[in-house]
Curated annotation (Swiss-Prot):
Belongs to the GTP cyclohydrolase I family. This is GTP cyclohydrolase 1. Keywords: GTP-binding, Hydrolase, Metal-binding, Nucleotide-binding, One-carbon metabolism, Zinc. It is an enzyme of class 3 (hydrolase). Pathway: Cofactor biosynthesis; 7,8-dihydroneopterin triphosphate biosynthesis; 7,8-dihydroneopterin triphosphate from GTP: step 1/1. GO terms for cellular component: cytoplasm. It catalyses: GTP + H2O = 7,8-dihydroneopterin 3'-triphosphate + formate + H(+). SUPFAM superfamilies: Tetrahydrobiopterin biosynthesis enzymes-like. It comes from the Bacteria. Zn(2+) binds at residues 78, 81, 150. It comes from Listeria innocua serovar 6a (strain ATCC BAA-680 / CLIP 11262). It holds the Pfam family GTP_cyclohydroI. InterPro entries: GTP-CH-I_C/QueF, GTP-CH-I_N, GTP_CycHdrlase_I, GTP_CycHdrlase_I_CS, GTP_CycHdrlase_I_dom.
Length: 189
C-alpha cells in the first residue's frame, strides 16, 4: 500500500497556519507541520493494514461459551472534522465448533479499524463483520462508547457526552437472554 506523503501533509499544515493568521516560521510552530505529518502517519496507520489478517490463525478449543473482551481502549479521527474521538470497545463472540481467536487479536482488529479517518458506526460494524467472516462464530456483539471532540470543542460544545453504537450478529441478535448476559458482563466491574 502507498506510504503516507508526510511532506505533502506538512506543506498543507503550513498553509492552514498561514490561513488562520499564524506565522509558521515562528518559534513554537516551525516544526509543527512535520510533527502533524508524523502524527497523521501514526493515527492513520490503519489505512495501510488489513485488520482481518489477525484472524488468519484460529485455535481449536473445546469452548463454545461466551468470549468477551471489554474495555478495549481505542482512538480514531472523525472523518468529518479530522478531530479525535476515543473511548472503549467491548467485543463478544460465541465460538462455533471450538474456533477461537487469541484474545489480543480482538484488540488488534479494533485498533486497525480505528486508525483511519472514520465514523464510530463504521468501526463497530466493520469489526463485527470481520469477526463473522473470519471466525465464523455463532454470533458477534460489538459495543463502542466514545467521546467525540467534534461535539466537545466545537459545534454544540457538550463535553462528556458519549456516543454508544452496537453491531449485533447471529445468536446475539436472536437471543435476548444471551444479549442481556453480555450487557450485564460489560457493566460488571
Amino acid at each position: 500500500m502507498e506510504q503516507i506523503d508526510k511532506q505533502k501533509i506538512a506543506d498543507a499544515v503550513k498553509v492552514i497556519l498561514e490561513a488562520v493568521g499564524e506565522n509558521p516560521e515562528r518559534e513554537g510552530l516551525i516544526d509543527t507541520p512535520m510533527r502533524v505529518a508524523r502524527m497523521y502517519e501514526e493515527v492513520f496507520a490503519g489505512l495501510k493494514k488489513d485488520p482481518s489478517v489477525h484472524f488468519d490463525t484460529i485455535f481449536e478449543e473445546q469452548h463454545e461459551e461466551l468470549v468477551l473482551v471489554k474495555d478495549i481502549r481505542f482512538s480514531s479521527m472523525c472523518e468529518h472534522h479530522l478531530v479525535p474521538f476515543f473511548g472503549v470497545a467491548h467485543v463478544a463472540y460465541l465460538p462455533q465448533n471450538g474456533r477461537v481467536a487469541g484474545l489480543s487479536k480482538l484488540a488488534r482488529v479494533v485498533d486497525d479499524v480505528s486508525r483511519r479517518p472514520q465514523l464510530q458506526e463504521r468501526i463497530t460494524t466493520t469489526v463485527a463483520e470481520i469477526m463473522m467472516d473470519k471466525l465464523k462464530p455463532l454470533g458477534v456483539m460489538v459495543i463502542m462508547e466514545a467521546e467525540h471532540m467534534c461535539m466537545t470543542i466545537r459545534g454544540v460544545n457538550k463535553p462528556g457526552t458519549k456516543t454508544i453504537t452496537s453491531a449485533v450478529r447471529g445468536a446475539f441478535k436472536n437471543d435476548d437472554k444471551l444479549r442481556s448476559e453480555v450487557l450485564a458482563l460489560i457493566k460488571h466491574n
